[in-house]
Structure formats: C-alpha cells, structure tokens
Amino acid sequence: METYYREEELKSLGLKKYGSNVKISRHAIIYRPEELEVGSNVRIDDFTTISGKVTLGSYIHIAQTCGLYGGDAGITMEDFTTLSSHSLIYAISNDYSGLSLACP
C-alpha cells in the first residue's frame, strides 16, 4: 500500500481545489474536504487533522500529527511555509455565536 493518495484518489476526496504534486498521507484526517484548497508541491504527513475552511499555498510541508482547525473563519498558509510536528493552529477557539451550547 502506498503512503500517499494517488492522483485519481485525490479526485475522489472531494477537495475544493488542488494543484500538482500534492501528497496527502492516507493516515491524514480531513473533515469538510469541500472547504480545503491545496496549491502545488504540498505534502501533508501522517495523523494530521484538517478541518473547516483551510487554504494551503504552494511549496508547503505539514509534518505529522499537526492540526489545522479552520472552522468557518478559515486559515491560510502562504507559499513556502512549513508546520512542524505536533503544531496546532486554530482559526477560532470557541463558538461564540450563541447558536449552540459551548464549554458546558
């Protein structure tokens, strides 16, 4: 079994957009893939979780066990950036909309 999704498998993930030479680990977790935009020459390693509105530029490496939680606000990583292992990025820390119970 290959470590990263093949090109035809990337199509079936339902990503909003992706460029060329994209490597996403089969062990990465992507929630709401229809909101994930990925540029070219991007690698996402094992056990990374991506959720919500996330935009990744080109020439990006996201190491293992990272978390990008974009929610509705969104996260953007610009070109030529890296995220070291175990790093977490939150667009918001809680839901203050009043539409649901948060932190009971």
Where on the chain are the PLM-derived regions?
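Extreme N-terminal tail/first-helix region
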Residues: 1-18
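Flexible, glycine/small-residue-enriched loop-and-beta-strand segment within the central core
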Residues: 2-7, 28-38, 43-104
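Conserved catalytic submotifs in the C-terminal HATPase_c
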Residues: 25
